[in-house]
Structures are given as structure tokens and as C-alpha cells.
């Protein structure tokens, strides 16, 4: 529509009324950044605007940039567009972008995490502010895990499983190497595990981000870098957190006998676990699962929904069947694909090829069962 508040351009998602972009994938003059993952925040923009809690991680990842920050919920006016940022629950500093112009309200979600069908605050991501539904006329949503097979287990159960794996390894004198994305996933792991089991060490790519989290007030354990450990005997009871790129590298030889595991939402797929060639797969994601996506969308009260990266075809079809006006933007965002190089990424891609079949298989009964009333989510409905 010609009067849309956000349109798609070759540089990224563009707000014509405000003359700025949201998470552009090519360099632009003004970029509003939803969070510091590499597919949403790129180098080369002249000016950046992001939520205040994101400053440390953005500067850690992008270096010296012209960055303006905005506290959550504080509104600014830019060329007549009223703009504010609201928590997305994804990673430290993640934000949804609320735009209001001439009576219309749009919200661009970026990536977000909602705890499925549960209203238990214990299911929120404990390393950042929880997702805040914002009332709007149009909601631009991700769909990284937009298939019915993706349903996250309660966090207490998940971390009990991780702790049991680590404890069993420690009792056997074997190091525990847990692979997960260096920004967001690693800190979620460090926050959730039982620190009493043994020492915790990290890869050198993880610790700078840990420092940014601690500076923002997030309680994380002390995490010496593994390469600085002098007493190699400590590794026999240790948990070592590292990015996926460390798997099978010469860096791992220092640990001697070790068991490895991978933490990702993609571990829900048996093929991904097999192709990753790890001893264990833990299903841990910083994105909303299928029920979480439905719950978040319903809570906005939006009449129109535009789907971005992930399983767009499935989500658009499902939304249309439920009565929403639905469409999609073709973006260059990668979801968690950065965590799945090589054959594992191919496994996820192969599962996308089955999307149309999966969409056909969602019965009315299934749709009715997974739609959760949004009444249990606190909603910011200012201006909409």
C-alpha cells in the first residue's frame, strides 16, 4: 500500500515518512537497530539508533559507530513520526520499533522471545527485559521457528538436563564442551546452569560479550578464558562454553577427554542433531516457538501482520486462515542460521522445503488449540 509506514527496499525495511531504515542489510544514512546480532546490525551506516541496554554489545561488536540510544518506552519525534523502542525479550538490548504517524501505528518486532503458551515469568529470558506486547494496527513479525513442531520445553527442565549432562561428565573426569552462539545463547547458558557443579570457562569470542552483559547489570558467573587456564586438571570437571565454530578445532585439544553438546532451537530436528555430530543436543532458543509466535501476534491486536525471515509461507497462510490480513517481506535476516554452518544449515533449509506441506497439515482443530488468549500478557497500548 502506498501509505504504508514501512516498505521494503533493496537496502532494507524503510520508513518513508521518517526517512530511516530498520535493521538495513546495506549501508544507509539512518538505521534503527533492533538488536546486535550480525544479521540485524551491520557496519557501514552513518547513524545508528538503538535501545539503551544494547549500547555495550553494539559497541563490542561494531566498534566505533555514531550511536544514539533511547531508553525503553521513551518517545522521540522524527519528521513527524513518533518512534519508541520496547523490549523484545530476545537478547540484551533487543527492541521492537513502534512507529506512529497520522493516526496509524506499526510495530516492527525484530527477533523476539515469548515463552510459548506460558504466562510464568520464570519462562522469560533471564538475561534481558521480557517481551512487551505493543498494541498496533500492523505488526511486522519474525517467523524463525514458525512451524508447529517447534515447542520449547520449560526452562527448569532444560537446564536440569544440561546440569545432569555436565555433572555426569564431571564425575567421570571428562570436560563438558557446550556449543552455542557467542552473543545471547552463551549468556543464557551461563545464567541458567548450576554453578556449583564445577568451574566454568569460555572461548575468547564469548568473554567480551560477557563483560558487556555484566556492565549492563546481568548476573553471570566469572568465566576465565580457556586458553588462559594453567592447570589443565581443572578441565576434567569444567563446563566450557564456546561458539559453534570451535567444534573440532585445534582449540579443543587442550581439554583432553571431553563430551560435546550443541544448544539451539534447531536441535528440535533429529537431522540437525545427527549432522551436527555432537554427543547431546539441547533445545534452547532465544526466539519464540510456534505457540509463542501466535501468542505474541494475538496480543498486539493488529489487524494486519507482515512476516519476515523464517517460515514465511506457513505463517502467512496460517494467519490468513485465522482472519488476519497477512503478507511477507523478503529480507536478508538469518534467524539462527548463523549457528548452523554446513550440513546442519542444509538440514534446516531442507525442512523449509516441506513448509507448504506442513501448512496444509495444520487442521482447524490444531489452529484452535494453539491460539492462546493474549489476556495474560501485559500490553502497552499507548496510542493504538
Residue ranges and their predicted role:
Residues 2-17, 21-26, 30, 36-177, ...:
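His/Asp/Glu-rich metal-coordinating catalytic cores
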Residues 4-23, 215-238, 242-251:
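A short, well-structured beta->alpha microelement
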Residues 41, 94, 116-117, 186-189, ...:
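Short, well-ordered alpha-helical microsegments
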Residues 59-61, 78-82, 117-119, 149-150, ...:
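Short, charged, surface-exposed secondary-structure boundary motifs
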Residues 66-71, 197-204, 323-332:
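Short hydrophobic/aromatic-enriched beta-strand-loop microsegments
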Residues 91-99, 112, 116, 138-144, ...:
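Active-site-proximal loop/helix segment associated with metal-binding centers of metalloenzymes
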Residues 159-241:
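Hard-cation-handling environments
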Residues 195, 226-384:
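C-terminal regulatory/interaction regions
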